[in-house]
Amino acid sequence: MNIAHTIFGVFGNATALFLFLAPSITFKRIIKNKSTEQFSGIPYPMTLLNCLLSAWYGLPFVSKDNTLVSTINGTGAVIETVYVLIFLFYAPKKEKIKIFGIFSCVLAVFATVALVSLFALQGNGRKLFCGLAATVFSIIMYASPLSIMRLVVKTKSVEFMPFFLSLFVFLCGTSWFVYGLIGRDPFVAIPNGFGCALGTLQLILYFIYCGNKGEKSADAQKDEKSVEMKDDEKKQNVVNGKQDLQV
């Protein structure tokens, strides 16, 4: 295996591990409060599916020289499974049913891909089938921050887009993109090239808006207006009281 190929793969493992562990802060809060509050559980089973498909694609009988792809995505699959189970434990009944349904579909999709690739396909056909499946869900995973980027542009604030998370999205996408180029593997290079581009856009947005306080939310503006009205009422009451004393 090419030394540069290995170096970028190891670096990709490190940055991807950071991204997988990033939601642990959210889950500490969920466990502490014994509630999922307003957090969405959808990203975790979807990321789990991406990890399972990518880990499967990296296995030697599917694609050669991609063991590092399997190791990090196998680790990610374990981490995401833990997240899903915690979310299911603390979620309200309606949300629990929805997330369990998505989780079941994820396992069904992965099982279908694995069984078809094992018993119906061989050689390049197997690699093509598994690679396409992994690529589609990798792009979907990388595209998930688009809503946050839109929020940043709308509010002119980076409050909901932490710098280090954006940085590691960029580093992870870039390292695996180069890894795919060196290994001449389009199924690794293409989705991670997309991730590299999105990470770059996130960093550009961060540096454009990092000095802004941003537009306040409607609720915050409403609260401030309410406080101001109460202050005005107090001042008016004081004035009226003084007038009564003078009379």
Swiss-Prot record:
The lineage of its organism: Eukaryota, Viridiplantae, Streptophyta, Embryophyta, Tracheophyta. The gene is SWEET1. Residues 221-236 have a biased composition (Basic and acidic residues). It comes from Arabidopsis thaliana. This is Bidirectional sugar transporter SWEET1. The chain crosses the membrane at residues 7-27, 42-62, 72-92, 99-119, 128-148, 163-183, 188-208. Changing P23T: Loss of sugar transport activity associated with reduced plasma membrane localization. GO terms for cellular component: endoplasmic reticulum; endoplasmic reticulum membrane; plasma membrane. Residues 1-6, 63-71, 120-127, 184-187 are extracellular. Residues 28-41, 93-98, 149-162, 209-247 are cytoplasmic. GO terms for molecular function: sugar transmembrane transporter activity. Mediates both low-affinity uptake and efflux of sugar across the plasma membrane. Can transport glucose, and, to a lower extent, mannose, fructose and galactose. It is found in: Cell membrane; Endoplasmic reticulum membrane. InterPro entries: SWEET (IPR047664), SWEET_rpt (IPR004316).
